[in-house]
Every structure is written in C-alpha cells, then in structure tokens.
C-alpha cells in the first residue's frame, strides 16, 4: 500500500470538501467529502453506486483531487474489510457531525462505496489549481 505524505494527510484532514475529476470525465468536477482514518484516505458516494465519479473510480479509472490550491492525482481501491469501513464511517460522522447529511454517509447502501485513495505513482503533485 502506498500512502500520502504527512503534509497531504494534514491538509486532507483540515479541508471540508474536495473536488474530484475522473479521467473519464475530466471537464466536470464533483464536490465530495474525504476523511482520514489511521492515515488512510477514504471517500464514499452518498448516492451509493449511482454516483458517476464512484463508478469511474471503482472501474479502475484514475482521478484527481482538487483542494487547498492543489491537484492530487489518485487511484482508488475498494475498502473491502469491515474494520476499514467502520473506521471511515466513524470519521465521516466525526468530521461532518454539523452537517445534516452526515447520517447519509453511513447508510447501509453507501457503505459498499467506501474507497481507499492512494497517490498515483510517477505523477507530480501540482500545487496550483486554476
């Protein structure tokens, strides 16, 4: 497993929302939530398996996260073990507890859409989003 550096993890912990662009649909970014649990980066589709960005990523397609003036190339792996899914759920509820949508992120139909993100190797991180 490849993971993000400490600065990237800190920035992702602090940011409330990120934009995600899949390589299949590079012209349209979707705003999503991201959490860090045990230094692993997780995302989840509140629309369940219907979310287009989720379908693109779960099919193995690459994507880019945009946040805090950065472009971060990522790839996704299904979070298949129940312990990781539970850790991610706790973090979604903790981080987004003030949002009325937080409970939607831990519904039974959204849990299978939990993805663990990793940096795409050999891709430079761009600090200028514009």
Region locations from a protein language model:
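Short, structured beta-strand-loop surface elements
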Residues: 48-123, 128
